[in-house]
Amino acid sequence: LIREDRRHLNTSSDSEVLLNVLASELQRFGAQRASASDIFAALSAVYRRVRGGYAVVVLIMGHGVLGFRDPNGIRPLVIGTRDGARGREYMLASESVALDQAGYKLLRDVAPGEAVFVDEQGRMHSQQCAAATHHTPCIFEYVYFARPDSIIDNISVYKARLRMGELLAEKIKRER
């Protein structure tokens, strides 16, 4: 990143690295007044360069808000909507309960490798920017990280925890 893109990193944060790669790719596309398709093309290049689990929401000043999820779906990302004073409004979050708390309704999960861009006019654009691979969500989202009242990838966290407990109890009974 330092040699190829001439970017200086201020921290050891993986988020800073990922966002610098995105900024470099946007710059490479010469996206002064980037369209949704320019942003999706830049993001496709980011997906080719970056490995790992992530769900990112970033404000691109003067353009809009971009949210994207890793191709394996390791980290969750959802989009919600509500009617506002200026029309339909969108919100991106890692958990459905964040939408609930802010008065939004869950629209859908952002698919692994998909990007959602809401432009300054409030229009939502979405595109599959990386080929989705084998969907491998992080088990700790269901076991520990997520709130029990969340829904991730159409799965109730509460019900998933109950089912895991039932399966664990069955296993313990068999081993006795």
Identify the meaning behind each predicted range.
Residues 1-112, 117-176:
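Conserved short alpha-helical segments that host acidic/polar catalytic motifs at enzyme active sites
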